Regions:
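PLP-dependent aminotransferase-like
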Residues: 123-180
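Conserved PLP-binding catalytic core of the aspartate aminotransferase-like
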Residues: 156, 303-304, 313-347
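Active-site pre-lysine segment of PLP-dependent enzymes
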Residues: 99, 164-173, 189-209, 213-246
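PLP-dependent enzyme catalytic core of the Aspartate aminotransferase-like
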Residues: 343-347, 355-384
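N-terminal secretory signal peptides and thylakoid transit peptides that target proteins
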Residues: 3-28
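N-terminal small-domain helix-loop-helix segment of the aminotransferase-like
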Residues: 38-115, 120
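PLP-dependent aminotransferase class I/II
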Residues: 67, 236-316, 320-322
């Protein structure tokens, strides 16, 4: 597969993850009804965007739905909706996550972590640099800006991967953190395990390393690749996870971070991740989703199969693409993004925004087989 070579200083990704702070309506709870046992048989997540039925393949949401255990769990949690989340309830989820990840419960922070972490570092450490790859997801960096944080942008390498040597070389005495998304978004590329381990180990000796692993669950070998292994060794590393991707809880915006004990404690002293910042329904959904490893495995297999089919279609169209590891493809159409996106929208398919300077590349979320066929046909029509 032909690989592109591009350089340049690129803008940050303005998208954000925000945590659910209010209760859900009965209609919203009904939307969490159990899905079919097989992920492939689950209902698609198309939405009426305009007058036509538009496929939302723009935000890397899961079309396969949450675990069938989530709906009943949320229904049961409605009984507790009049009550604030207690410390004991939050601790139960922290213990569940800690057991799953092999860390201590006090290292688990549930709630708005990336943005709050960026703000905390800027406020507590003083003005300084926050290094990250561009184009990319820059929520943490953007959150630090109003408090003296300075974005230090490092372009992707020729294979559209995080440029590990360049990121490492950019660390300076005033660097407050190095933020890396692996697999990367929007390219989907995965930094190799051994190389990434060496990179993190070297970087964390000089600054805090924050690894966003939002898409790592789509890999069968996620546990062997996760930077959590380095955190367990006592390294200066924070790992962020969201349940908005493979667990299909984007509408609840549930996630957590795993951090060194000292940093986790400092964040809690600032009120980050406390019981008051949670809600009954999100906690119930998270606990149920994390417990259903069978559903996660089904979704992983389904997405992997559909990713292969997408690559076959793209090859057939004569297009080059990255070896994306998440639930999306990143492909060079050879045409302006705006024209392709507008053409696809006319065909009822919404894709992600442009990621400059890759102005001819498009990111398309992998949906259900039916959704993907529709998107592939639309892409072929637009490029004909």
């Amino acid at each position: 597969m032909t690989r592109p070579t591009m350089t340049g200083t690129l803008p940050a990704d303005p998208q954000r993850r925000h945590w659910l702070r209010a209760g859900l309506t009965t209609a919203a709870v009904a939307a969490l009804a159990p899905v079919a046992g097989s992920a492939a048989a689950a209902a698609p997540s198309a939405a009426a965007d305009t007058a036509i039925d538009v496929l939302r393949l723009d935000l890397n949401e899961s079309s396969y739905g949450p675990s069938p255990k989530v709906g009943p769990a949320v229904q049961r949690a409605l009984v507790e909706a009049p009550r604030y989340v207690s410390a004991a309830q939050l601790q139960a989820l922290q213990v569940q996550i800690a057991t799953l990840e092999g860390v201590a419960p006090e290292q688990v922070i549930v709630g708005e972590v990336l943005e709050a972490l960026g703000q905390h570092l800027a406020l507590s450490e003083g003005a300084g640099g926050f290094i990250y790859s561009v184009p990319g997801y820059g929520a943490l960096v953007d959150a630090a800006r109003p408090f003296g944080g300075r974005a230090v942008e490092v372009p992707l390498n020729a294979r559209l991967e995080n440029d590990l040597p360049a990121l490492l070389a950019t660390i300076a005495p005033d660097t407050r953190a190095l933020f890396v998304v692996n697999p990367h978004n929007p390219s989907g590329t995965l930094s190799p395990g051994a190389d990434f381990d060496r990179f993190v180990s070297a970087a964390q000796a000089r600054t805090l390393v924050i690894v966003d692993e939002a898409y790592l669950d789509y890999r069968e070998d996620a546990a062997a690749l996760s930077a959590v292994r380095l955190l367990r060794q006592g390294q200066n590393v924070v790992v962020f996870r969201t349940l908005g991707k493979i667990h299909a809880l984007a509408g609840l915006q549930v996630g957590y971070a795993l951090a060194p004990t000292g940093l986790a404690g400092a964040l809690r002293q600032r009120g980050v991740g406390g019981a008051h910042a949670q809600n009954q329904l999100s906690l119930a959904a998270a606990a149920a989703a994390l417990a259903d490893t069978v559903h996660v495995a089904q979704v992983r297999r389904s997405v992997a199969l559909e990713r292969q089919r997408w690559q076959q279609v793209l090859t057939g169209l004569g297009l080059r693409s990255t070896e994306a590891a998440g639930n999306f493809v990143f492909v060079d159409t050879g045409r302006p993004h705006a024209a392709v996106a507008a053409g696809l929208l006319q065909q009822g398919v919404r894709i992600a925004r442009v990621f400059a300077p890759y102005d001819t590349w498009v990111r398309i979320t992998i949906g259900t087989p039916a959704e993907n066929r529709r998107a592939q046909q639309a892409l072929g029509h637009v490029l004909a």
